[in-house]
């Protein structure tokens, strides 16, 4: 085909080549599109444009002579110098075309021509365009005589390639129109347009030269090109649709997989449902409800609901995304169509100037003006037609997109319909052969669903029968139990009843056996269906592979298989599909019939029926095989079963006879069928055999199969006959004992399956689908024989079944004729099938032709792969941008959600901590809030954060830096999560404790209720007895009033009981909270004590050495001044002055110093010398220095007393200060103190009080130095009493005696510690200037002497357990004129200057001061006192006082958790009364001392069990009444004055916070009233310390706080006078929760919240 075309083009006059071979030549590498419809006529593709190549362009030749290209065409050399030409149409449409510059010099471009060698000249649709282009190029080069090589060769003759070519052909050429018409034969224009074009061509050829003709040809070629472009775009759109269809197919497959998974899940849930039903039936039978099962099921239901909701939400989201993407794709398609239309409009606009120039040039070349209007009109018509064609193409594109969408939707609906209902077409066409396995698969699925439903029904029936069986067994057991104790009569009754039970049991067993058989049958059928499904899938894969192989072979060889092979393949596939479907249907019907037969047998016979065992391989034969009887019954039950079986034996015999008759009918039908088959094969069916069985072996194989079936039926009939005979024998001997009814059945059961297996093995090769063709004809007859039951004739057991006998000819003649008629009908149907096959052959030929055409088109489509790839890349890039945009939005949303989650998580954490804190403190949450963990505003969060930061201030000893609370680092998140985990664990522990307590309370309540019910019953009994005894007198009583009074009294008692019960519960809860808190605090204290013990021991050693040296250096001075002070007689002067008692505390930083020995002081001189030699008193030369640990000092002053009233008793003021410079410097003025209750909890409801130190009740004394600063002295702080008129001067009005004592104390302290003090007062005179010893009595001097001796006995000093000391001074004025001063020492625990950052400054001490004031028990008092220190007339103190606890003060117990310590001692060790102190045991001097001074030393030997020692002054006889005497006995000291007297001369301080510490109101009010009465009648007591406010916190004149460190922690110095009669019930070492190292977050909250319950 190519050679003539090349020759004609070389000569120049031949017709152009046909376009189809050219297209076939160019599109040889195109792969077939898998989803393009090939059968629709409207989808056929036009010829594509030619591909660019070296031989398809005419401007690429560089030689001067013509040379043939690869296609066989010649290229003119004159086209070298034509220069670049513009092809207007293709430059607009093919925007992606790249110019190919020619080689060699080029002249300036001439006017635009029709062809363009630089922009895909080869894309033209016909060879005529090339010819005309060459001619027009030569003519244009001749006209434009430029200075190029083309101009020089204008007049030269053409090259050899053009030599044979004529100048423009004559216009009258008769074959020119036909050539033009044939060149546009493939055009899409209608026939009228083509005829118009041919007429126009003839007219133009007649009118003038070939200019107009060339123009028309160019327009036609452009029209063809544009149509090809439209087809190309249409094909690309189809390919794009195919790509999207593939994605939809993948999604559909995934959805199917999900559907399969959901169906599996549904089956599992159905199984669980059945299991639950069984459980519910069991529960209904037993009457017990499984609570765990119900809870588990409820949980499963909740989980499943949540999962389903989540899955529905995800499906909705995916559906929304899919709809959005489809909308975007639709919009993109619309935009693509619009851009194509815009490009076409622009192309037309660009064509207009080129057409103008062509018209002008054509008019110049033709030179005829009369034909010009006609040409213009024709060109205008052509343009209009072209424009209309473009618009029509745009509309077609739109319609095409709509049709593609509709096609996709219809395909999806069709697939759904097929997946649900299967293929409903009865006849399968050739195209649907590949889909035949799908239809079979759907059919099998339907069958499987039916089988599963039947299995479900059977399983439910099994459950019901099991329940019924259990009920019957229970009845049998009851009957056995009732009949076991009786005699023979009971046994006979039981046997009669047992017969009925045996019958029901046998019936139930038969039912159960039947159900098991059907279940086994269903299992086999399901297994067979699965195997068949696998086989069908394998066949489908094989057919698909064969189909693909056929397609590839046809693609490679461009031919299809031969017609006979295609015919045979189609016929074989059809037959295989039909026969396999029929076989499966028949097998299923056979199984259904067998199950129906079993049910009929079960309904007919009332005894044990034989099992029906199905041959699963053949699928069409059944055999009656009995089953074993199961477990053996008891002897009497066995006899009853035998009787029942004997009664049922006639029924079994009748059933066996029916089965044997059915076998006779089957054998008779089979014999007639075999004879008719042979006759048909011999006479009429030879042609049918040739068509049906190509191997000519079908007849013998059918005969073999029928013979095998008949043999098996004969064996079964023989066995049935034997059973019938034995049954007759058994029925004949009915008078004898009933024999076993089925003696031959075991042999039968053992023989049948073996024969079946042998037969199935022998005939396994014959059971092929072709062999079942004839078998299908007589199987319905067998079923019909079973249904009609036409079994009247009695079978002959000795009959031998032959294929054919002469005596049976008459009986079988009619059947043979019937069979012949049936075979004739089958022959006719086969002829019809042959005709259909011939038609199929014809269709196959047509399909082969269409297939060849499609292959050509596919090869052409291969050249368009580049453009398609570009479209795909554009779509992919667009999709990628859309995905990037979508994921960026998702990322932003996720970031916002994560930030919101962090924010909410922090809110939840803060709320949870707040809740735990309040719960630990025993506070009740507000009930009106729905969710206490919900934080509704940022304000609430910042309030919580502020509280947290304040607590962090106290714990870290730093001010709040105001940092932002949001930390975005991973470490902060991990820390927050860890804290949340710890908080949740604590919450879980608390909840467990609450639950445990709740269960205990419930048990207690139940016990109490039970006891109350018993008591109520007893009381009712007593009341009834009393009423009976009263008799008639009861009727005379006023009934209603008496009952109403009793009712009111009962209601009041119930109300009181409820109140007391609620109070007891509250007390119990607070007690548990306190015990839990104090157990934690004890562990933390022990841990810290062990950590700091080594440091304290080191300091103890150093200070002990230093003290021992200082004591040795001070001994000569003590001896010298003791002699001088004996002659001193200045006691009256000291009495005349208004002296002030100074009480101080010496708490140096010692770890091991203890109280050594107590000595009596007989005179003031000895007391002065004792004070001079004391290592804790500083000298005046070291005032301006500080102690090593930097303790601050303060001078203590008291309120004045009126001078005209003598004080009979003055309360000793004991002040303490544990603060150091470091802790005092960072102490905030707004720091809070922890309130402590001095009430030890007692489970019996009795509150036991202990006595705190005096400084804890009255506060720390406050003075100012010269600069106005506050000074707190931790050493000896002696309290002084000054007159009221000197109250304005504050510290300057102190007496010289008190100033001397203070100065001397500081000097000794400096001397003992090797440092100096920061003293702020003037130098004070010596003690002998007061001349106090002149008026001393002998007792006083003896006391002073005792004190001196105690000061000297340093080598015999001993140690106590508590390691620091405190002096208590009490000034008492008796009825005589002698004023005595008693100085006692109390011990305080060691302190350390080491502070942890996580501990509050208020918790800087090692051990709480309270550990010294709590004794082990109020019942344990030291009794080994050698001699009392005071006169016996005042009696010994009462060592145990208890007062009834009140319900309104239970809030004070919430902070208590006292544990038994290792110390032993008395609770009176803190008291400073004049009664004999039980701690002063082992004192050797026999004098009654009013000055009892205990010296400090570094020795560590211990004598006392309790680390406290005090001296007490003698009080006046009791004359204040019962209440005051009670207070005196409990507190151990005289009642202190009221706070009103102290508040007269000081500012009233404002409370620290709403959570400030309160005074016990009831006790303080009584104390204040009694003290005021006593002071008004006799004297005014020393008032409380100045600057003590209602909240018990010390303030200076400006209201600023003075917070000693240790006292502030334990809140021991901020209590009112009422707490003085509170005593401990056990000894402990305790500190506040703010000291807890493990709970730093609660340190700031505890003090604020624990006082809130008031």
From Swiss-Prot:
Residues 1406-1505 are annotated as: KR-rich domain required for microtubules binding. InterPro entries: MTCL1-3, SOGA1/2-like_CC, SOGA_CC. The keyword Heme does not apply. GO terms for biological process: cell division; chromosome segregation; insulin receptor signaling pathway; negative regulation of gluconeogenesis; regulation of autophagy. Keywords: Cell cycle, Cell division, Coiled coil, Cytoplasm, Cytoskeleton, Golgi apparatus, Membrane, Mitosis, Phosphoprotein, Secreted. Induction: Up-regulated by adiponectin in primary hepatocytes through the insulin signaling pathway. Down-regulated by amino-imidazole carboxamide riboside (AICAR), an AMPK activator that potentiated insulin secretion. Pfam families: SOGA, SOGA1-2-like_CC. Residues 1-188, 348-379, 1122-1146, 1427-1450, 1537-1560, 1627-1654 are annotated as: Disordered. GO terms for cellular component: extracellular space; Golgi membrane; microtubule; midbody. The keyword Coiled coil applies. Proteolytically cleaved into a C-terminal SOGA 25 kDa form that is detected in plasma. Proteolytically cleaved in primary hepatocytes into a C-terminal SOGA 80 kDa form. The record marks 922-923 as: Cleavage. Residues 55-66, 132-147 have a biased composition (Low complexity). Residues 102-113 have a biased composition (Pro residues). Microtubule-associated factor that enables integration of the centrosomal and Golgi-associated microtubules on the Golgi membrane, supporting directional migration. Preferentially acts on the perinuclear microtubules accumulated around the Golgi. Associates with the Golgi membrane through the N-terminal coiled-coil region and directly binds microtubules through the C-terminal domain. Required for faithful chromosome segregation during mitosis. Regulates autophagy by playing a role in the reduction of glucose production in an adiponectin- and insulin-dependent manner. This is Microtubule cross-linking factor 2. It comes from Mus musculus (Mouse). The lineage of its organism: Eukaryota, Metazoa, Chordata, Craniata, Vertebrata.
């Amino acid at each position: 085909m190519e050679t003539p075309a090349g020759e004609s083009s070389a000569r120049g006059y031949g017709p152009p080549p046909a376009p189809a071979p050219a297209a076939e030549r160019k599109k040889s590498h195109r792969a077939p599109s898998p989803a393009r419809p090939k059968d629709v006529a409207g989808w056929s593709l036009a010829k594509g444009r030619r591909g660019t190549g070296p031989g398809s362009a005419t401007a690429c030749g560089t030689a001067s002579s013509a040379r043939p290209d690869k296609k066989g065409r010649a290229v003119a050399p004159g086209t070298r110098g034509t220069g670049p030409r513009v092809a207007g149409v293709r430059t607009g449409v093919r925007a992606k075309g790249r110019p190919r510059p020619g080689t060699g010099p080029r002249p300036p471009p001439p006017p635009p021509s029709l062809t363009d060698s630089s922009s895909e000249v080869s894309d033209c649709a016909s060879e005529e365009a090339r010819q005309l282009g060459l001619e027009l190029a030569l003519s244009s080069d001749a006209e434009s005589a430029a200075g190029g090589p083309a101009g020089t060769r204008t007049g030269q003759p053409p090259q050899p390639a053009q030599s044979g070519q004529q100048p423009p052909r004559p216009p009258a050429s008769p074959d020119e129109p036909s050539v033009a018409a044939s060149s546009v034969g493939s055009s899409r224009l209608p026939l009228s347009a083509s005829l118009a074009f041919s007429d126009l061509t003839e007219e133009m050829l007649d009118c003038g030269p070939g200019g107009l003709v060339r123009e028309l040809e160019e327009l036609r070629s452009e029209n063809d090109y544009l149509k090809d472009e439209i087809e190309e775009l249409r094909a690309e759109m189809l390919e794009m649709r195919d790509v999207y269809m593939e994605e939809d197919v993948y999604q559909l497959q995934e959805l199917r997989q999900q559907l399969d998974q959901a169906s599996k899940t549904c089956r599992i849930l159905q199984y669980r449902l059945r299991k639950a039903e069984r459980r519910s039936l069991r529960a209904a039978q037993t009457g017990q409800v499984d609570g765990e099962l119900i809870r588990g099921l409820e949980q499963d239901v909740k989980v499943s609901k949540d999962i389903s909701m989540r899955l529905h939400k995800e499906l909705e989201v995916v559906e929304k995304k899919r709809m959005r993407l489809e909308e975007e794709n639709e919009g993109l398609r619309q935009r693509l169509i619009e851009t194509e239309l815009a490009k076409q409009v622009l192309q037309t606009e660009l064509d207009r100037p080129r057409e103008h120039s062509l018209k002008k040039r054509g008019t110049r070349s033709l030179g005829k003006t009369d034909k010009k209007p006609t040409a213009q009109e024709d060109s205008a018509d052509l343009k209009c037609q072209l424009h209309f064609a473009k618009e029509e193409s745009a509309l077609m594109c739109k319609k095409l997109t709509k049709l593609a969408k509709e096609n996709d939707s219809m395909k999806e609906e069709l697939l759904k319909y097929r997946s649900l209902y299967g293929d409903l077409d009865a006849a399968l066409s050739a195209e649907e052969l590949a889909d035949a396995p799908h239809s079979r698969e759907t059919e099998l699925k339907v069958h499987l669903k039916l089988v599963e439903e039947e299995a479900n029904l059977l399983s439910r029936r099994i459950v019901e029968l099991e329940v019924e069986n259990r009920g019957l067994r229970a009845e049998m057991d009851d009957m056995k139990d009732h009949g076991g104790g009786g005699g023979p009569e009971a046994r006979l009754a039981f046997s009669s009843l047992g017969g009925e039970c045996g019958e029901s049991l046998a019936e139930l067993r038969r039912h159960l056996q039947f159900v098991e058989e059907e279940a086994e049958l269903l299992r086999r059928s399901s297994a067979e269906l699965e195997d068949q499904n696998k086989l069908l899938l394998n066949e489908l894969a094989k057919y698909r592979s064969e189909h693909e192989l056929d397609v590839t072979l046809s693609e490679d060889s461009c031919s299809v298989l031969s017609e006979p092979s295609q015919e045979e393949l189609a016929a074989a596939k059809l037959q295989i599909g039909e026969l396999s479907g029929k076989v499966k249907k028949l097998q299923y019907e056979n199984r259904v019939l067998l199950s129906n037969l079993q049910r009929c047998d079960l309904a007919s016979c009332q005894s044990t029926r034989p099992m029906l065992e199905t041959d699963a391989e053949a699928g069409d034969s059944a055999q009656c095989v009995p089953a074993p009887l199961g477990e053996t019954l008891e002897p009497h039950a066995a006899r009853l079963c035998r009787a029942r079986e004997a009664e049922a034996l006639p029924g079994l015999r009748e059933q066996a006879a029916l089965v044997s008759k059915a076998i006779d009918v089957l054998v008779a039908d089979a014999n007639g069928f075999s004879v008719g088959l042979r006759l048909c094969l011999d006479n009429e069916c030879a042609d049918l055999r040739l068509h049906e069985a190509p191997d000519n072996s079908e007849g013998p194989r059918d005969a073999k199969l029928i013979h095998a079936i008949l043999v098996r039926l004969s064996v079964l009939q023989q066995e049935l006959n034997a059973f019938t005979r034995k049954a007759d024998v058994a029925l004949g001997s009915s008078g004898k004992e009933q024999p076993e009814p089925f003696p031959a059945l075991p042999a039968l059961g053992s023989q049948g399956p073996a024969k079946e297996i042998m037969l199935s093995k022998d005939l396994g090769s014959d059971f092929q689908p072709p062999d079942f063709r004839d078998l299908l004809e007589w199987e319905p007859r067998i079923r019909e024989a079973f249904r009609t039951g036409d079994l009247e004739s009695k079978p002959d057991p000795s009959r031998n079944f032959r294929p054919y006998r002469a005596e049976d000819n008459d009986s079988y003649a009619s059947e043979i004729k019937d069979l012949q008629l049936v075979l004739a009908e089958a022959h006719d149907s086969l002829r019809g099938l042959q005709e259909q096959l011939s038609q199929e052959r014809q269709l196959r030929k047509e399909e082969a032709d269409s297939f060849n055409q499609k292959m050509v088109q596919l090869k052409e489509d291969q050249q368009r792969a580049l453009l398609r790839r570009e479209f795909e890349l554009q779509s992919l890039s667009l999709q990628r941008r859309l995905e990037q945009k979508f994921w960026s939005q998702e990322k932003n949303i996720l970031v916002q959600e994560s930030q919101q989650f962090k924010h909410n998580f922090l809110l939840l954490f803060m709320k949870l901590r707040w809740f735990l804190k309040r719960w630990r403190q025993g506070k009740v949450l507000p009930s009106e809030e729905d969710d206490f963990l919900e934080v509704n505003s940022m304000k609430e969060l910042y309030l919580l954060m502020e509280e947290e930061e304040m607590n962090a201030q106290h714990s870290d000893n730093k001010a709040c830096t105001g940092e932002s609370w949001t930390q975005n680092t991973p470490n902060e998140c991990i820390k927050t999560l860890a804290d949340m985990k710890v908080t949740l664990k604590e919450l879980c522990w608390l909840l467990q404790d609450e639950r445990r307590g709740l269960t205990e309370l419930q048990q207690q309540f139940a016990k109490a209720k039970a006891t109350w019910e018993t008591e109520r019953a007893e009381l009712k009994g007593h009341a009834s007895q009393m009423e009976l005894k009263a008799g008639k007198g009861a009727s005379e009583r006023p009934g209603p009033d008496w009952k109403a009074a009793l009712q009111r009294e009962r209601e009041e008692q119930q109300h009181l009981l409820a109140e007391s019960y609620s109070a007891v519960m509250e007390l119990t809860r607070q007690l548990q909270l306190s015990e839990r808190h104090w157990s934690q605090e004890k562990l933390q204290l022990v841990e810290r004590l062990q950590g700091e013990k080594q440091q304290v021991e080191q300091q103890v050693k150093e200070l002990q050495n230093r003290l021992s040296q200082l004591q040795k250096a001070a001994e000569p001075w003590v001896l010298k001044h003791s002699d001088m002070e004996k002659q001193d007689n200045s006691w009256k002067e000291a009495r005349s002055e208004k002296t002030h008692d100074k009480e101080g505390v010496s708490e140096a930083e010692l770890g091991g110093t203890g109280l050594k020995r107590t000595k009596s002081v007989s005179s003031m001189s000895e007391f002065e010398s004792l004070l001079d030699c004391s290592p804790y008193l500083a000298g005046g030369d070291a005032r301006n220095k500080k102690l090593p640990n930097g303790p601050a000092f303060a001078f203590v002053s008291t309120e004045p007393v009126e001078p005209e009233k003598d004080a009979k008793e003055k309360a000793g003021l004991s002040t303490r200060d544990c603060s150091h410079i470091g802790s005092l410097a960072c102490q905030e003025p707004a720091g809070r103190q922890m309130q402590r209750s001095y009430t030890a909890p007692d489970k019996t409801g009795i509150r036991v009080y202990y006595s705190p130190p005096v400084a804890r009740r009255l506060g720390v004394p406050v003075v100012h130095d010269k600069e106005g600063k506050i000074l707190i002295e931790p050493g000896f702080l002696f309290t002084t009493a000054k007159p009221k008129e000197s109250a304005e001067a504050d510290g300057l009005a102190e007496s010289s005696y008190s100033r001397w004592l203070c100065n001397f104390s500081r000097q000794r302290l400096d001397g003992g510690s090797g440092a100096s003090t920061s003293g702020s007062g003037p130098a004070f005179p010596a003690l002998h200037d007061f001349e106090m010893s002149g008026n001393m009595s002998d007792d006083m001097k003896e006391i002073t002497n005792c004190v001196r001796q105690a000061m000297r006995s340093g080598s015999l000093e001993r140690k106590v357990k508590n390691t620091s000391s405190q002096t208590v001074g009490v000034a008492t004025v008796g009825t005589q004129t002698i004023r005595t001063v008693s100085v006692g020492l109390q011990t305080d625990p060691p302190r350390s200057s080491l502070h942890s950052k996580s501990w509050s400054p208020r918790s800087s001490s090692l051990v709480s001061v309270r550990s010294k004031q709590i004794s082990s028990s109020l019942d344990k008092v030291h009794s080994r006192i050698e001699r009392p220190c005071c006169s016996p007339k005042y009696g010994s103190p009462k060592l145990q006082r208890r007062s009834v606890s009140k319900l309104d003060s239970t809030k004070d117990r919430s902070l208590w958790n006292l544990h038994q310590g290792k110390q032993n001692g008395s609770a009176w060790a803190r008291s400073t009364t004049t009664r004999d102190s039980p701690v002063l045991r082992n004192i050797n001097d026999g004098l009654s001392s009013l000055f009892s001074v205990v010296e400090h030393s570094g020795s560590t030997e211990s004598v006392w069990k309790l680390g406290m020692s005090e001296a007490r002054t003698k009080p006046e006889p009791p004359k204040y009444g019962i209440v005051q005497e009670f207070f005196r006995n409990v507190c151990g000291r005289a009642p202190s004055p009221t706070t009103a007297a102290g508040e007269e001369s000081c500012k009233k301080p404002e409370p620290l916070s709403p959570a400030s510490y309160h005074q016990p109101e009831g006790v303080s009010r009584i104390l204040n009233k009694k003290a005021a009465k006593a002071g008004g009648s006799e004297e005014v007591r020393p008032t409380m310390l100045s600057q003590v406010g209602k909240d018990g916190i010390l303030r200076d004149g400006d209201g600023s706080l003075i917070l000693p460190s240790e006292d502030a922690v334990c809140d021991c110095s901020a209590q009112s006078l009422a707490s003085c009669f509170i005593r401990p019930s056990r000894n402990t070492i305790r500190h506040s929760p703010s000291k807890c190292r493990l709970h730093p977050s609660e340190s700031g909250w505890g003090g604020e919240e624990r006082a809130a319950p008031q």
